[in-house]
Amino acid sequence: MDFLEIVGQIPLKGGVEISGAKNSALPILAATLLSQQEVTISALPQVADIKAMASLLQNLGAELDWFNSHTLKLCAKSLRHTEATYDLVRKMRASILVLGPLLARFKECLVSLPGGCAIGARPVDLHLKAMQQLGAEITIEQGYIHAKAAKGLKGNDILFDKISVTGTENALMAASLAKGITRIINAAKEPEIAQLCTFLQSGGVEIEGVGSSELKIRGVESDALSLKDIQIIPDRIEAGTYLCVGAITNSQLKINHIIPNHLQAITDKLIEIGFPLDIQQNSIEIYPAKKRQAFEITTKEYPGFPTDMQAQFMALATQCLGTSVIEETLFENRFMHASELQRLGANISLKTNIATIHGSTELTGSDVMATDLRASSALILAALVAKGVSRVHRIYHLDRGYERLEDKINALGAKVLRLKEK
């Protein structure tokens, strides 16, 4: 198992190229199961979750041809079976995204209950209710979801009690081959969902309301879609993380290959804290702040402040003057990084879903353990400003969602080594 050794308090400067968005690539990869045609997906990030999804598709019988590490040609014309097994699904929660496409196209599938980050209760019941609304029979058998729709899926209204990104994506994909019109009410509005809509539209699916909380989908009257090639959008969470690298080290950094509109909640907060930003069409440059002010954050669904940036801003709060408050409203148990930040010297108190961070604090290098994907990046941020050497363990969490993070940070002047545990 690997860990990262990080020498703190080194000045950083330069630019970072942002990779394709993992959270856009995963549903788009799953959606290729709806198609009988070859489709090429470019700008795929080279991260563990993408490799896991590619392995799952290959196991189902899809033909995969990697042109290079970021471009993949797929063909799901003839699958061997429609069972997504535990061995493959347990590696990440996003595996549940194959449920909608498999059910819609093949009328029956078995999908293991998923794994991935251990962040509180992330139930799949919203996905199952959506499939049932489209006419599926659902049973849970020995840890597997067994979904059947012998006569195919039929369009219907799907009302989500709670906004769900992957739930919306599964419903969208299933509705693409359902007979008639489906309305998804209280849909998630993330840019990654908008790109999935674009991909499905390229295959002939009519979708109204893209980017809004209500989507209207007219299913294609055929057995499969004819999807067109697509390039994955830049990863707004990776971009936000590197903006935080600049912010916590108070360095001048340029973040390239981004869509600034997708980052507005993050950039607004950085400006509020005191950072001058130069926002261009596809880049953002962050400059050192004269004074970093404490702040308050409440995580919300897009376009609100993303829960996937909460941990990074908690690390940043340790270097801001005054008392910062972070309220997590979307997931339970998403403050597991707080105790590890405390090991570095952070002054953090927790009460249910609210974290209070007192700054600014001088951090000291130590051994810390990543508990999930975004927590791992928060610990690396803190280590960059800690006095001495830090070691971040269990970075397999990091590798699920960040492409070559140590290489990108080292190119800015940092000293980060990937080493093997003894």
From Swiss-Prot:
The record's listing under PANTHER family reads: UDP-N-ACETYLGLUCOSAMINE 1-CARBOXYVINYLTRANSFERASE (PTHR43783:SF1)
Q: What GO biological process terms does the UniProt entry carry, in alphabetical order?
A: cell division; cell wall organization; peptidoglycan biosynthetic process; regulation of cell shape; UDP-N-acetylgalactosamine biosynthetic process
State where phosphoenolpyruvate binds.
K22, N23
Query: What's a Gene Ontology MF term here?
Result: UDP-N-acetylglucosamine 1-carboxyvinyltransferase activity
Q: What Pfam families is this protein classified in? A: EPSP_synthase (PF00275)
This protein's pathway reads: Cell wall biogenesis; peptidoglycan biosynthesis
One GO cellular-component annotation of the UniProt record comes to:
cytoplasm
The listed locations are: Cytoplasm
Active-site residue list? C117
What is this protein for, i.e. what is its function?
A: Cell wall formation. Adds enolpyruvyl to UDP-N-acetylglucosamine.
| Record-stated family | Belongs to the EPSP synthase family. MurA subfamily.
Tell me which EC number(s) this protein carries.
2.5.1.7
- Which amino acids does the record list as binding UDP-N-acetyl-alpha-D-glucosamine? R93, R122, P123, V124, D125, L126, D308, L330
Highest taxon listed in the record's lineage = Bacteria
Where in the sequence is 2-(S-cysteinyl)pyruvic acid O-phosphothioketal found? Answer: C117
> What keywords are annotated for this sequence in UniProt?
Cell cycle, Cell division, Cell shape, Cell wall biogenesis/degradation, Cytoplasm, Peptidoglycan synthesis, Pyruvate, Transferase
* Enzyme class, broadest EC rank: transferase
Q: What is this protein called?
A: UDP-N-acetylglucosamine 1-carboxyvinyltransferase
First-listed, main subcellular location of the protein, grouped into a coarse class: cytoplasm
